[in-house]
């Protein structure tokens, strides 16, 4: 199983476009050949960002996505503070990637990260899906309510 870290923009995109490439990565990371790695700081950012009213997601969809991340994510506690990214808030994704020894950090904003950090490649959802020929059928509703 390949470990990955997902930038918050991938989670947001997955919820806004449930049949897009970010949604495919998200589904694979929650129950496929990929394993989502998450830290407390990353989870807190996911929760804060996807709950913003401008994204217009129902409370049920938000709760379902967060529950799936909590239950199926591989939780790590980074011990090293990094100062690599121009935006200090992005460093937590590299810290998690380093602590979990992930192969890929998937983002929609490649310019926010170095192309590679230690053994972690920073890629888009499309690049990650192509790199391993990963495909998934994403149902109309990725997250079940209840």
Can you annotate each of these PLM segments?
Residues 1-3:
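Residues that mark the start of a beta-strand
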Residues 5-6, 16, 21-51:
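PIN/NYN-family metal-dependent endoribonuclease catalytic core
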Residues 8, 40, 108-110:
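Short secondary-structure boundary segments
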Residues 55-56:
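Membrane interface segments of multi-pass transport proteins and intramembrane proteases
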Residues 59-70:
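Short, well-structured alpha-helical segments
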Residues 71-110:
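Active-site neighborhoods of divalent-metal-dependent phosphate/nucleic-acid chemistry enzymes
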Residues 91, 98-104, 110-146:
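Acidic, PIN/NYN-like endoribonuclease modules and their adjacent C-terminal/linker elements
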């Amino acid at each position: 199983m390949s470990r990955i870290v997902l930038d918050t923009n991938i989670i947001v995109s997955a919820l806004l476009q449930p049949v897009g490439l970010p949604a495919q990565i998200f589904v694979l990371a929650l129950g496929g050949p990929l394993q989502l790695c998450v830290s407390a700081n990353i989870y807190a950012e996911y929760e804060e960002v996807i709950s913003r009213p401008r994204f217009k997601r129902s409370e049920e969809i938000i709760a379902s996505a967060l529950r799936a991340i909590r239950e199926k994510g591989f939780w790590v506690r980074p011990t090293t503070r990094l100062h690599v990214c121009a935006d200090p808030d992005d460093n937590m994704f590299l810290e998690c990637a380093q602590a979990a020894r992930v192969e890929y950090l998937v983002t929609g904003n490649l310019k926010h990260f170095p192309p590679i950090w230690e053994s972690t490649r920073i890629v888009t959802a499309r690049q990650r899906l192509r790199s391993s020929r990963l495909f998934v059928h994403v149902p109309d509703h990725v997250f079940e309510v209840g």
